[in-house]
């Protein structure tokens, strides 16, 4: 009786083991089959990490990067999160009976330059549209939208009629000789505008791009505001296109600060965003018909506040990834092919890899504000990689050599990691991140104690101080190292140690793409 019972127990366990093994084999087979069907056997693979896994490193950096926009705000501050900032620029625009008090100060000074500010808004919008879910996962979507709206509120008021756009508040000749807190400014802040007599195509078109992209961001949450933005975008694009002329030529004073090298890229950029916002084929025809004239097909360029071609090429590539009815468009195909050439130039092991790279791996193009091209390139690479993975395209060919889509993402991470401290200097270039970061940032508000009252000139005692800034400009991405990977942390070094809003907008986009398992929506609408 006892032997029989033992025998039956042994048989039961044996059968259970067989069944369990069969189930495991079936699961493994199913996973392999699904992987093969999805194309992962081609070596592309999905984005690493389990769905929804948050990378704390990038999440912490993202929160800081967005905080920098609060530091740069002008106007009457609502829900002020920065203890050493207060209301400023409240009378901006009053000489022409306008309220231009909002907007952002451009960098470490107190000028509101409309051209880079609009670009900041466009990039912020793009980042939110593509990676809003990732931002939301770490509670940063609302801060991003708040900062965007602070800019677009300003841009709306800077465009009081169809063919008039105020593009600057303040005069660098008056502002730059001063070193004071924005709250203490008493100098005159004259206005600069473009109109039919003094056109500025690049600024009008960039502002149109900002308005069009932002209209998509607010389409669901505030349809009325979205419609207002889109109306302004259409008017500004028409103004930019029908009254062509470079603002750098017509207003030569801007050349020393934000000199434009041409307006064709902004026209294509604005038309691309207007197509995404409206699906009006007129705008798609515009980029197809004017590509030969403006797009520099086959010649990779660097994405920046001045040159929007690479961004336009990636944005239009998105249409071919996700809109099958446009797959036969020859005009769009040229944009996508050039976008691929840009990507191949960024991959370190590509036959066409750029030589504009430091020994530590940082994309490096110019001494002044060297981080701009690295952060913009990384942002575009992350986008393109996600477009590929979302549409189940896992390979990119560079002169016959095959690379995985995830290698573009790896490149993007390498640039982000460099900025966050993984570099030969062992320093983070994002203020407040890590144990070692710049202490003497070229930034007036950060360098002067909040309880100090200074005039134009007596604030220079703080500029010349040997003590670190009393206020930390959290999240500011400074200019960056020289090609030989040296860096001087000094207020007297704006070339390397001054932050800008547009660099931070690109950083927000990059970090948002990396903060969790990454993907993009098939439609921006």
UniProtKB/Swiss-Prot annotation:
Location in the cell: Secreted
EC number: 3.2.1.4
Presence of keyword Cell wall biogenesis/degradation: yes
Pfam families per record: Glyco_hydro_9
GO biological process, one term: cellulose catabolic process
Catalytic residues as annotated in Swiss-Prot or TrEMBL: 109, 442, 489, 498
UniProt xrefs under PROSITE patterns: GH9_1, GH9_2
Catalytic reaction annotation: Endohydrolysis of (1->4)-beta-D-glucosidic linkages in cellulose, lichenin and cereal beta-D-glucans
Molecular-function annotations in GO: cellulase activity
Gene Ontology CC entries for this record: extracellular region; mitochondrion; plasma membrane
Protein name: Endoglucanase 10
């Amino acid at each position: 009786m006892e032997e029989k019972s033992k025998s039956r127990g042994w048989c039961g366990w044996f059968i259970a083991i067989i069944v369990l093994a069969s189930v495991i084999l079936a699961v493994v087979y199913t996973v392999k089959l699904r992987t093969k069907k999805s194309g992962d056997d081609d070596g592309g693979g999905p984005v690493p990490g389990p769905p929804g896994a948050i990378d704390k490193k990038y999440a912490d950096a993202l929160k800081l990067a967005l905080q920098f926009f609060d530091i740069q705000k002008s106007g009457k501050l609502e829900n002020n999160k920065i203890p050493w900032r207060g209301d400023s620029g409240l009378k901006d625009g009053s000489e022409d009976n306008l309220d231009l008090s909002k907007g952002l100060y451009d960098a470490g000074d107190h000028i509101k330059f409309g051209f880079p500010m609009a670009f900041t808004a466009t990039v912020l919008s793009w980042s939110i549209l593509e990676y809003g879910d990732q931002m939301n996962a770490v509670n940063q979507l609302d801060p991003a939208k708040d900062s965007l709206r602070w800019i677009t509120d300003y841009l709306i008021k800077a465009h009081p009629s169809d063919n008039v756009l105020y593009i600057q508040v303040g005069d660098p000749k008056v502002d730059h000789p001063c070193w004071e807190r924005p709250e203490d400014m008493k100098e005159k802040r004259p206005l600069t505008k473009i109109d039919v007599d003094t056109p500025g195509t690049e600024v009008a078109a960039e502002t149109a791009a900002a308005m069009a992209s932002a209209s998509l961001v607010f389409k669901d949450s505030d349809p009325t505001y979205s419609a207002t933005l889109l109306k302004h975008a259409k008017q500004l694009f028409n103004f930019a296109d029908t009254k062509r002329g470079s603002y750098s030529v017509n207003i030569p004073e801007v050349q020393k600060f934000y000199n434009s090298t041409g307006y064709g890229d902004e026209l294509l950029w604005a038309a691309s965003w207007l197509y995404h916002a409206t699906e009006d084929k007129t705008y798609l025809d515009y980029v197809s018909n004017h590509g030969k004239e403006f797009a520099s097909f086959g010649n990779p360029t660097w994405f920046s506040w001045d040159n929007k071609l690479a961004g336009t090429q990636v944005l239009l590539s998105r249409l071919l990834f996700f809109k099958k009815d446009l797959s036969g468009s020859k005009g769009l195909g040229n944009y996508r092919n050039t976008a691929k050439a840009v990507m191949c130039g960024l991959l370190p092991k590509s036959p066409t890899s750029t030589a504009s790279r430091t020994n530590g791996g940082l994309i490096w193009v110019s001494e002044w504000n060297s981080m701009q091209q690295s952060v913009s390139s990384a942002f575009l690479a992350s986008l393109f990689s996600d477009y590929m993975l979302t549409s189940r395209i896992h390979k990119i060919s560079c002169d016959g050599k095959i690379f995985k889509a995830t290698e573009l993402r790896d490149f993007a991470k390498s640039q982000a990691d460099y900025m966050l401290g993984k570099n030969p200097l062992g320093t983070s270039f994002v203020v407040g991140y890590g144990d070692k970061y710049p202490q003497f940032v070229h930034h007036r508000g950060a360098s002067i104690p909040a309880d100090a009252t200074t005039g134009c000139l007596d604030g220079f005692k703080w500029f010349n101080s040997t003590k670190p800034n009393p206020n930390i400009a959290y999240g500011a991405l400074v200019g960056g190292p020289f090609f030989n990977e040296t860096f001087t942390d000094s207020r007297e070094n704006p070339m390397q140690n001054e932050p800008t809003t547009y660099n931070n907008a690109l950083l927000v986009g990059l970090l948002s793409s990396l903060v969790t398992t990454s993907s993009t929506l098939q439609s921006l609408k």
